[in-house]
């Protein structure tokens, strides 16, 4: 064999050796991957079994997940791979609720908590009820149910003894929402404890029905008889059930309140009894012009006044910014403020670009503007075609226009044809007083009251 033939043979042997080595390395990698896969499966089984044990201790937050896995765990079967993945997400959420390590289920439980059923007294109503006890009113919510849990806020005996609904207030506003689940209500008790002073409470809604999912208001009206003066207690009972007729835990709710009523009649004075006359005269002097003295020698205040001797005027809404209530619903504002509630300031120079005067010579600017008078825009390049600056170089464009500065497109022509009004949107009219209709072309008739004496 020649030297050239030997060289070719050596090259072929070298190539065969390289191929064989690569095949061996590939087999080793396959075995290692198979070994790792087995270890992962074992770990996954262990995790799924532990998540099943942890899942057994959870309650309503993971009801759907428990129903799906009960048939597998209860019969001793190992969950399938797809269900093991479900357990790792859902079961981990259960443990996450306790230790903060889990994922999906725990966050779902939190979302359910945030969207649970709630019932509370309207903040504006609570300000009015507590205005006599707190100078600025009590502005926090007072819950009867908060996130599906019945609270004791409205059932507190201290509140019952402390809070008396004044004679000027004839209703109590409540706000409620059911959230994601369906709940049904039934007012099974609307009762007065003294029918001579207060009639039975009535509702602005049906006595029973479904609680709205979104936030809604309803009122409980408190009609005084008008025949007697005094303070009467009344009770409100409320049952709440799920769509499966299961009562909400903590219900029925029993709420007790007190309502003051004032008789507006005139009492007779026994002139034959000098002592009685003197006492009544003294009582009348104390009550002043804002009230009158009843047969029990107690001042009963006219509408809009309160206090032991009817010396305090009652303003609702409250006077703001340090204003004083000097007469029923009349606020005397301090220097620099104006408005029925002293809610607005007095600015020597007008606030520009939609700004609002909130204090003496101080403007509250709209979005996208700043300065003492809101005269400066945050848009370096002004918005065109009646666009409005709402942020740093950010314009809000009218319909039909677009672009960074509302420079692209054509403004839509308004189809609003108001004859006796002004356009408030693309196709809606706001009619002047005395007119109505889509285009404000209808005139309201004026009712003229004729005096019968004019015949003669």
Swiss-Prot record:
Residues 119-261 form the WIF domain. This is Protein shifted. Disulfide bonds join 224-261, 283-293, 287-299, 301-310, 315-325, 319-331, 333-342, 347-357, 351-363, 365-374, 379-389, 383-395, 397-406, 416-423, 418-429, 431-440. Interacts with hh. Residues 77-87 have a biased composition (Basic residues). It is found in: Secreted, Extracellular space, Extracellular matrix. GO terms for molecular function: signaling receptor binding. The lineage of its organism: Eukaryota, Metazoa, Ecdysozoa, Arthropoda, Hexapoda. Changing residue 374 to S: In shf2; induces defects in the hh pathway. Residues 44-55 have a biased composition (Basic and acidic residues). Glycans are attached at residues 57, 173, 217, 227, 324, 420. Residues 1-30 form the signal peptide. Keywords: Developmental protein, Disulfide bond, EGF-like domain, Extracellular matrix, Glycoprotein, Repeat, Secreted, Signal. GO terms for cellular component: cell surface; extracellular matrix; extracellular region. The keyword Disulfide bond applies. At the blastoderm stage, it is ubiquitously expressed. As embryogenesis continues, it is expressed in the epidermis and central nervous system, this expression being segmentally modulated. Also highly expressed at the foregut and hindgut throughout embryogenesis. In third instar wing imaginal disks, it is highly expressed in the most anterior and posterior parts of the disk and weakly expressed at the antero/posterior (A/P) compartment border. In the leg disks and the antenna part of the eye-antennal imaginal disk it is also weakly expressed at the A/P compartment border. It comes from Drosophila melanogaster (Fruit fly). Required for normal accumulation and movement of lipid-modified hedgehog (hh) morphogen. May act by stabilizing the interaction between heparan sulfate proteoglycans (HSPGs) and hh, HSPGs being required for diffusion of hh morphogen. Not involved in wingless (wg) morphogen movement, suggesting that it may provide HSPG specificity for Hh.
């Amino acid at each position: 064999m020649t030297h050239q033939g030997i060289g070719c043979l050596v090259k072929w042997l070298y190539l065969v050796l390289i191929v064989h080595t690569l095949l061996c390395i590939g087999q080793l990698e396959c075995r290692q991957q198979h070994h790792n896969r087995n270890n992962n499966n074992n770990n996954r089984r262990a995790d799924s079994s532990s998540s099943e044990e942890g899942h057994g201790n959870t309650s309503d937050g993971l009801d759907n997940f428990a129903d799906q896995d009960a048939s597998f765990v209860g019969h001793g079967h190992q969950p399938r791979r797809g269900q093991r993945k479900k357990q790792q997400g859902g079961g981990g959420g259960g443990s996450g609720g306790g230790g903060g390590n889990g994922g999906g289920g725990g966050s779902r439980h939190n979302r359910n908590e945030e969207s649970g059923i709630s019932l509370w007294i309207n903040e504006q109503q609570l300000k009015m009820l507590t205005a006599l006890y707190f100078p600025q009113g009590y502005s926090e919510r007072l819950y009867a149910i908060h996130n599906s849990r019945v609270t004791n806020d409205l059932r507190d005996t201290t509140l019952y003894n402390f809070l008396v609904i004044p004679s000027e207030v004839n209703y109590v506003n409540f706000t409620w929402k059911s959230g994601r689940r369906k709940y049904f209500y039934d007012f099974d008790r609307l009762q007065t404890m003294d029918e001579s002073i207060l009639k039975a409470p009535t509702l602005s809604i049906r006595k029973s029905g479904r609680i709205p999912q979104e936030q809604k208001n309803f009122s409980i009206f408190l009609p005084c008889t008008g025949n007697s003066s005094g303070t009467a207690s009344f009770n409100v009972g409320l049952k709440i059930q799920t769509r499966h007729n299961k009562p909400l835990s903590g219900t029925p709710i029993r709420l007790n309140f007190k309502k003051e009523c004032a008789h507006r009649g005139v009492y007779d004075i026994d002139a034959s009894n000098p002592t009685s006359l003197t006492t009544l005269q003294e009582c009348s002097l104390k009550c002043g012009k804002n009230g009158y003295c009843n047969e029990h020698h107690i001042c009963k205040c006219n509408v809009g006044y309160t206090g032991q001797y009817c010396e305090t005027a009652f303003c609702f809404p409250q006077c703001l910014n340090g204003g004083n209530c000097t007469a029923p619903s009349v606020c005397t504002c301090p220097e620099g403020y104006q408005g029925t509630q002293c809610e607005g300031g007095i600015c020597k120079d007008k606030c520009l670009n939609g700004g609002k005067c909130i204090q003496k010579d101080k403007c509250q600017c709209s979005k996208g503007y700043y300065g003492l008078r809101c005269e400066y825009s945050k848009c370096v390049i002004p918005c065109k075609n009646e666009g409005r600056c709402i942020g740093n170089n950010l314009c809000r464009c009218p319909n039909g226009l677009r672009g960074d500065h509302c420079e692209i497109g054509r403004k839509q022509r308004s189809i609003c044809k108001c004859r006796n009004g002004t356009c408030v949107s693309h196709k809606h009219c706001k009619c002047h007083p005395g007119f109505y209709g889509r285009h404000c072309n209808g005139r309201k008739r004026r009712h003229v009251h004729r005096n019968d004496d004019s015949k003669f």
